[in-house]
């Protein structure tokens, strides 16, 4: 079995439109917080997704 890479984190990208829709991505631990403009299917628009805590 392969070893997991400990230098990366799984992060949740939550929609700033307030719909509750999210994407899960991985990023290096040393990198700054992620923010992307991606498609939110609940409102049928592209909106900003910002990193939030995974539960």
Swiss-Prot record:
InterPro entries: Ribosomal_bL33, Ribosomal_bL33_sf, Ribosomal_zn-bd. Keywords: Mitochondrion, Ribonucleoprotein, Ribosomal protein. Pfam families: Ribosomal_L33 (PF00471). It is found in: Mitochondrion. GO terms for cellular component: large ribosomal subunit; mitochondrial large ribosomal subunit; mitochondrion. Its main location: mitochondrion. Component of the mitochondrial ribosome (mitoribosome), a dedicated translation machinery responsible for the synthesis of mitochondrial genome-encoded proteins, including at least some of the essential transmembrane subunits of the mitochondrial respiratory chain. The mitoribosomes are attached to the mitochondrial inner membrane and translation products are cotranslationally integrated into the membrane. The keyword Signal does not apply. The keyword Mitochondrion applies. GO terms for molecular function: structural constituent of ribosome. Component of the mitochondrial large ribosomal subunit (mt-LSU). Mature yeast 74S mitochondrial ribosomes consist of a small (37S) and a large (54S) subunit. The 37S small subunit contains a 15S ribosomal RNA (15S mt-rRNA) and at least 32 different proteins. The 54S large subunit contains a 21S rRNA (21S mt-rRNA) and at least 45 different proteins. bL33m stabilizes the tRNA acceptor stem in the E-site. Belongs to the bacterial ribosomal protein bL33 family. It comes from the Eukaryota. GO terms for biological process: mitochondrial translation. This is Large ribosomal subunit protein bL33m.
């Amino acid at each position: 079995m392969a070893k997991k890479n400990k230098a990366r984190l799984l992060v949740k990208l939550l929609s700033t439109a307030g719909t509750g829709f999210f994407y899960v991505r991985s990023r290096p631990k040393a990198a700054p917080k992620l923010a992307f403009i991606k498609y939110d299917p609940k409102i049928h628009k592209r909106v900003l997704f910002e990193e939030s805590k995974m539960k």
